[in-house]
Amino acid sequence: MNKHLPTMVPRLAARFVLGIAVFALATGASVMALRAQGAARTVWNGVFTAEQAAQGKAVFENKCATCHGAELNGGEMSPPLAGAMFVSNWSGQSVGDLFTRIHTTMPQNDPGSLNNAEVSQVLAYILSFNQFPAGAAPLPSDDASLGQIGITDKK
């Protein structure tokens, strides 16, 4: 009989239990992360209304189109707000990030002059123009809510 057997069995059992515990924790953390990702809203979840986008079009035409163009294709000094370039530039960021950029830096000749509702309307128009679907509830105007909505090119 092996003289180390009495101490080996408890050690092996302890290692086995520890291995199971680590596996369970890792699996649980992975499942929770996947659930959190699945629960996150994106621009593909109908985060604005068609009415809000129509209101945003009017604001855009009045305050933004001079620089960004009627087709949102950008200009000499202005980035495009439509198409693959726009989505690529903002993919992985939140609608809140875009809201903050517009609110604090636009329009270029009068930064910060748009109120929160106008910025949300313009955002709704930009999203609509980029073929993201409208939904039943309007896009909110607060950073906390907007920060929970991701911009992505994937549905």
Where are the regions a protein language model picked out?
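N-terminal secretory signal peptides that target proteins for export/translocation
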Residues: 1-14
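Bacterial N-terminal signal peptides
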Residues: 15-30
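Generic structural signal for alpha-helix termini and adjacent loop/cap motifs
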Residues: 70, 104-105, 129-132
